[in-house]
Amino acid sequence: MSHSTDAHTLARWMAGEFSNEAQALANPPLWAHIKVCMRPLPNQFFDGYGLYLEQAYSSDTSAPYRLRLFHIKPVDDHMELVHYKPKDDAKTKYMGAARNPAMMQHFDMADLDPMPGCDMIVTWSGTSFKGTVQAGKGCRVVRYNKESYLDNSFEITDNALISIDRGRDPVTNEILWGSLAGAFEFEKINNFSGEVQPH
């Protein structure tokens, strides 16, 4: 049984490649086929558990549209997933590392920007971990020349990831982009949990 500050289990469950192929094939107009690949970082990078994420359309996983680094931090009765992204001039050093982890030896904290307001609060539900972006509309994104705030959440088990990824209008809360038809449903197709180092 896990619990709300079990960073080791969360890291093991997150470590893998996830695909929503079944969802995309069942309803192509609503769902693109996306792959999310998360690789464990060496423990010393963040002084604790961390993962590197690349998210891409399955047709071109060599050109991910989202690069993130997560530091899993137990805090009181929950965990925080602290978000970082590579600076624009460092992206080429990172791109591809989720599928070629030897590249991670060249990762450097100096290449990263923190993402204020975008960290996620993670708790244990009894059967899964659930995460929601911290309250306050602070995770701002400009898309289609319009400012939005991220309204993100996820639920993860040892073999599946369900996520909602939306941008909302800061004033009206109207959904401007993202998961309009509901949650993305990803299955783990490659398991990297064996790469998670004890801490």
From Swiss-Prot:
Gene Ontology MF terms: lyase activity
EC number assigned by the record: 4.-.-.-
GO annotation terms (biological process): protein-phycocyanobilin linkage
Organism superkingdom: Bacteria
InterPro entries hit by this protein: CpcT/CpeT (IPR010404), CpcT/CpeT_sf (IPR038672)
Main EC class the enzyme belongs to: lyase
Keywords: Lyase
Changes seen on gene knockout: Cells are a yellow color, 40% reduction in phycocyanin and grow slowly. The C-phycocyanin beta subunit (PhcB) in this strain is missing the phycocyanobilin chromophore on position 153.
Pfam family, one: CpeT
Known role: Attaches a phycocyanobilin (PCB) chromophore to 'Cys-153' of the C-phycocyanin beta subunit (PhcB). It does not attach chromophore to CpcA, ApcA or ApcB, the other phycobiliproteins.
UniProt family annotation: Belongs to the CpcT/CpeT biliprotein lyase family.
Protein name (database record): Phycocyanobilin lyase CpcT
Protein's organism: Picosynechococcus sp. (strain ATCC 27264 / PCC 7002 / PR-6)
Gene that encodes the chain: cpcT
